[in-house]
Amino acid sequence: MSAITRHGDALVIRLYIQPKASRDQIVGLHGDELKVAITAPPVDGQANAHLTKFLAKQFRVAKSLVVIEKGELGRHKQIRITHPQHIPADVAEFIE
């Protein structure tokens, strides 16, 4: 299964999250998931909120259009981004 798939006007992205990183960045593939490093700690939903904000900024959409479908409490997540306005170059190569 691919890390990123298109479903109509949305992208579904399987992620592996690295919390408490030195900076926010899309790292690349990690197995069959896209690895994303974020600076927020995995405490009280801070990492999820920070991840949503980071991805919304990268794809130039409102935070409400970035939804965590699976994996609220773990490092392995599935995210849906509806109507992405921009697709970062380091993500575009993995879309199927």
Swiss-Prot record:
The lineage of its organism: Bacteria, Pseudomonadati, Pseudomonadota, Gammaproteobacteria, Enterobacterales. GO terms for cellular component: cytoplasm. SUPFAM superfamilies: YggU-like (SSF69786). Pfam families: DUF167 (PF02594). Belongs to the UPF0235 family. InterPro entries: DUF167, YggU-like_sf. This is UPF0235 protein ECA3630. It comes from the Bacteria. It comes from Pectobacterium atrosepticum (strain SCRI 1043 / ATCC BAA-672) (Erwinia carotovora subsp. atroseptica).
